[in-house]
From Swiss-Prot:
A GO term for molecular function: phosphotransferase activity, alcohol group as acceptor
Protein's recorded name: Anhydro-N-acetylmuramic acid kinase
EC number: 2.7.1.170
Residues given in the record as ATP binding sites: G12, T13, S14, M15, D16, G17, V18, D19
Reactions listed under catalytic activity: 1,6-anhydro-N-acetyl-beta-muramate + ATP + H2O = N-acetyl-D-muramate 6-phosphate + ADP + H(+)
Source species of the chain: Shewanella baltica (strain OS185)
Length: 369
């Protein structure tokens, strides 16, 4: 069978780098051919972080960063292809998620905005780009997120197996695969790594809490945990999605103000428990038992995985590597898959997940010619 090569580009709310993957979809399961992470330069990272907060002169900043992020994504593609023997002419298309700078689907006229100019990516790589995947779903009344459950359904579902796929990036989201004719469900549970990353960056100037070691050295404060879990988002019915607009450093500082007597490591432990408890609460609402497979950066946090296992004794816990997909690259592979769906004219959203009025082909194509 002829190879079907696509590239997926993903940079999540953690902004910890641009993941680029080359995937072959010619077989029954996606085959990861090559992978690469392009670091986000500090000046660009600071600009993106500023753009995520309301300020003045946003249009000029947005325009510049849109091009800059497009150039960075193109660099990620070119460096990815330099690692393997696949020529750019063999790649059917790039699926670029872009970098989310606003996600506000619940306004009267909801919107989401990802930057990283696809015209720049196409021009600098010589490969057609498919991008802007989320806004069609929002135009149809949906949340525009999460989009990965459709990929999870095709890749991980098995008849007779009740499975949950948990993606822990900056925000955590779950896909419920019931193993029968029932509807696939999926939604954002709340913070994944975003708050634990923000706190260690603020206190220790470290990018993330490696293996959850700092959290493990602390003791969770139940009063603070209960206050954090009282956020209205956690009691919302699905479909629902969230982002840094709700769970950010400003919100965290506001929540911490009555708890300034706590040790810094105790706060870190409590924030990790916020992630774990909010995930576990939503999973238990779906089913008390089944198989739970984790992907995203959280899959490599041993302390997080231990705490999740303790909260979900009825679940067999593993990473998606047990199903043949490297947890580090799962989301990048999903956006390569979304590019393939667009190229073939096939729908890629699940209305039961996003709340859209119907299925739709997602994304627009930007030619390299």
């Amino acid at each position: 069978m002829k190879n079907a090569y696509y590239i997926g580009l993903m940079s999540g709310t953690s902004m910890d780098g641009v993941d680029a993957v080359l995937v072959d979809f010619s077989g029954a399961q996606p085959q990861l051919i090559a992978s690469h992470t392009e670091a986000i330069p500090s000046h660009l990272l600071k600009g993106l972080q500023r753009l995520c907060l309301p300020s003045t002169d946003e249009i000029n900043r947005l325009g510049r960063l849109d091009r800059n992020v497009g150039q960075l994504f193109a660099l990620a593609v070119n460096n990815l292809l330099s690692k393997c023997t696949i020529a750019k002419e063999e790649v059917i298309a790039i699926g670029s998620h872009g970098q989310t700078v606003r996600h506000m689907p619940n306004l009267e006229v909801g919107f989401t905005l990802q930057i990283g100019d696809p015209n720049t990516i196409a021009t600098e790589t010589g490969i057609d780009v498919i991008a802007d995947f989320r806004r069609k779903d929002i135009a149809l009344g949906g949340q525009g997120a999460p989009l990965v459950p459709a990929f999870h359904q095709q890749t991980f579902a098995e008849v007779g197996k009740k499975r949950i796929i948990l993606n822990i990036g900056g925000i955590a989201n779950i896909t419920y695969l019931p193993g029968n004719s029932d509807q696939v469900l999926g939604f954002d549970t709340g913070p994944g790594n975003t708050l634990v990353d923000a706190w260690i960056q603020q206190v220790k100037s470290e990018p993330f809490d490696r293996d959850g070691e700092w959290a493990a050295s602390g003791k969770t404060d139940q009063g603070l945990l209960m206050q954090l879990l009282s956020h209205p988002y956690f009691s919302l019915a699905y479909p629902k999605s969230t982002g840094r607009e709700l769970f950010n450093q400003a919100w965290l500082e506001q929540q911490l103000s009555p708890f300034n007597h706590l040790d810094e490591e105790d706060i870190q432990s409590t924030l990790l428990d916020l992630t774990c408890h909010s995930i576990a609460q939503d999973i238990i609402k779906l089913s008390n038992e089944g198989e739970l497979f984790v992907c995203g950066g959280g899959a490599f946090n041993g302390q997080l995985m231990q705490r999740l296992a303790a909260l979900l004794p009825g679940y067999k816990l593993d990473t998606t590597s047990a199903l043949g997909v490297d947890p580090k690259w799962a989301e990048g592979i999903a956006f390569a898959w979304l590019a393939m769906r667009n190229h073939l004219g096939l729908p890629a959203n699940l209305p039961a997940v996003t709340g859209a009025s119907r299925e739709a082909v997602l994304g627009g194509r930007f030619s390299a010619k």
